[in-house]
Regions:
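Class I SAM-dependent methyltransferase "Motif I" SAM/SAH-binding loop
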Residues: 9-13
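Conserved SAM-binding strand-loop segment of SAM-dependent methyltransferases
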Residues: 47-54
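Conserved SAM/SAH-binding beta-strand->alpha-helix loop
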Residues: 34-35
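Class I S-adenosyl-L-methionine
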Residues: 58-68, 75-235, 242
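A short, Lys/Arg-enriched amphipathic alpha-helix followed by its capping loop at the start of a domain
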Residues: 2, 19-26, 44
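C-terminal target-recognition/interaction regions appended to catalytic cores
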Residues: 202-308
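Conserved SAM-binding loop
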Residues: 41
Length: 308
């Protein structure tokens, strides 16, 4: 199997990097504008060179020599939950165009871009794709659900693979049996509280009652927003739904409930047990919710390395 020297643009907690290392590759450089993300990426990848800056202003000609570019550009402008502050999101971190600049400067034989499902609906996606193809790359666009590949979470994302070849390299990964939320959640841990309190939202109480009726159980997951299972509940005998950058899922057990612990979120994202995370629940949740599941990334790069 070929061994890649990788760089990681927009490196947060390091799902792309961690998966690459799990697949036997090196991550030699990583960058992000957020100092906390860089701090924890560095703690988890101490042998990687790190920079903290807006990557739209980076000089990619100064990067060390590499042969695989990994990138997860900002997804806020493409996701369904982007809200009304798109302008703030667009200036808060570099966009997908930084990938084009890096590819033009480094001309690696391989790259991988991860983003949300709606990324391909972006008004400038065709122009972005054309710009990359003009640099000599063939692109395959692969919509993958992490739950199909051993990750205990339904997480649908685009993985775009670019190669300097005449034909694209589509990802044909072997699917696996689903891993359930029950296998991750520790019902004996966490801070449980009574369901019926004065502070509990009537909408939350209604969702819990609907969950009891629909699932015919007193122990289940309750999303705090969304549609579908967000209106009722979610069985522990299926993968959890998509984790985001804020607390999204609670666990109902009889007449009490609690939110997911950071350690449970780490497991749902398939990060290794020795992953270093911030002690603050809110910051750890944000880093995990922005990440790529390393277990899926490992399989992607194993497949690409064998096929490239």
């Amino acid at each position: 199997m070929r061994k890649f020297n990788c760089i990681d643009l927009f490196a947060g907690l390091g799902g792309l990097s961690t998966g690459a290392v799990m697949a036997g590759h090196n991550v030699i450089w990583a960058g992000n504008h957020w100092d906390t993300a860089v701090e924890y990426h560095q703690l988890n990848h101490p042998n990687t060179e790190h920079v903290c800056q807006d990557l739209q202003q980076a000089n990619f000609y100064q990067l060390p020599s590499y042969d695989c570019l990994l990138a997860s550009p900002a997804c806020q402008g493409h996701s369904l939950g982007r809200g009304r502050d798109l302008a703030r999101h667009e200036v808060s971190r570099s966009t997908a165009w930084a990938v084009v600049e890096a590819l033009e400067a480094g001309s690696p034989p391989l790259f991988e871009v991860e983003n949300v499902e709606k990324f391909t609906d972006w008004n400038l996606f065709k122009a972005w794709k054309y710009a990359i193809e003009s640099l000599g790359y063939s692109l395959s666009i692969n919509l993958l659900d992490a739950a199909d590949y051993g990750v205990p979470q339904n997480r649908l994302r685009n993985f775009i693979i670019g190669t300097k070849s005449k034909k694209p390299l589509p990802l044909k990964l072997e699917k696996q049996a689903p891993v359930t939320a029950r296998s991750v959640i520790d019902l004996d841990s966490g801070n449980w509280s009574p369901i019926k309190t004065k502070r509990r939202s009537p909408k939350t109480l209604a969702r819990i009652e609907r969950g009891r009726r629909e699932l015919k159980t007193d122990t289940f997951l309750i999303p705090y927003y969304s549609s579908g299972s967000g209106l009722t509940g979610r069985s522990l005998d299926r993968p959890i739904g998509t984790l985001t950058t804020v607390d999204r899922y609670g666990i109902v057990r009889g007449d009490e409930m609690r939110m997911l612990t950071v350690d449970e979120m780490r497991k749902f994202m398939s990060f290794p047990d020795d992953t270093k995370l911030p002690p603050q629940h809110k910051i750890a949740t944000k880093l995990l919710g922005n990440a790529v599941p390393p277990l899926l990334q490992k399989q992607i790069l194993e497949y690409v390395a064998a096929a490239a």
